[in-house]
Amino acid sequence: MLFRSVHEIHKSSFWAAERIEKIQECKSVALLHETLIKTCSLSDVQFASSRIRQGFESWEKSKGLFEKLDQSDLARIIPHVLMFRPDEKEENLVYSWVGMQSTAAKINGLDWVEESTGEVAHRAFGCETQSFAEKVNVGYVKTMISGEPLYQHIRTLVRLEDQEPFWMPYERLLTRHVLRGGGFAVICNIYPTQYVNVSLAGNP
């Protein structure tokens, strides 16, 4: 889908200034849905990015057993993913691994990566909003409980310091893996792309 910028021409500088003022006012209006998520059929993975396809194929080959992941596949995938495990009381899912080349690491920075281990998935930190953290956490919990992969298209509003907010569309694959000790972990594989089947919620 192609999007074209819209240019307005006003003969009067007064009306142009009025229009600019109205647009600026709209930018401060809170959006009803800053994060939109669509769960897709697993059959759609064949049309996904190569990273998502490789992650799904590796999960299928290993039958969800982490120790049976092909070492070359693991070396290729692990720098790009997030991993979540239950905490000691098994009450919350927490970050147990953040790949340095993951989208989350690139957006939030090195300090966030270093502080992320042990953080609860549904609580906002870094540049996340609480609404975003809670919405994306639902998929982690579903995958952890069911053991079934989730392939999703997501569009979310990203707000960074000293930058204009922007919409980031991406696809996400969640898979559950059995670890060597017998516990479970959810691996989150994200790939930013414009080819997501989620309507644009509006302009920030």
Give short role names for the model-derived ranges.
Residues 40-71:
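Glycine-rich short-loop/terminal segments
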Residues 1-42, 72-204:
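Sensory/regulatory domains in signal-transduction proteins
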